[in-house]
C-alpha cells in the first residue's frame, strides 16, 4: 500500500470527506485528492498534523503495508 492509498483508507476509516480532511489540515480538497492519487505527496509540514489526526506515528504513516481494520 502506497502513501496515497494509506491516506485514503485512513480518511475513510474516520468517515471524513476530502473537503473535511482538507479543512482540518488547511489544504484544499484538490490537494487531498492529489495525495490520494499519488500525484503529489504531503509536505513535511503536513505529515505531523496528518499523524496527529489519525493518531499514528510518522513511522506508521510512512510504512507501506496494509492497515489493520
Predicted regions and their residues:
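Short basic helix-loop element that most often maps to the first helix and adjoining turn
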Residues: 5-24
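Short, Lys/Arg-enriched C-terminal cap helix and immediately downstream tail that follows
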Residues: 8, 44-45
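Short, charged recognition helix plus adjacent turn
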Residues: 62-69
Amino acid at each position: 500500500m502506497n502513501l496515497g492509498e494509506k491516506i485514503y483508507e485512513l480518511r475513510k476509516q474516520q468517515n471524513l470527506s476530502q473537503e473535511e480532511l482538507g479543512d482540518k489540515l488547511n489544504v484544499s480538497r484538490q490537494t487531498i485528492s492529489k495525495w490520494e492519487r499519488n500525484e503529489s505527496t504531503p509536505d513535511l509540514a503536513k505529515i505531523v498534523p496528518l499523524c496527529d489526526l489519525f493518531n499514528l506515528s510518522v513511522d506508521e504513516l510512512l510504512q507501506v503495508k496494509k492497515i489493520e481494520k
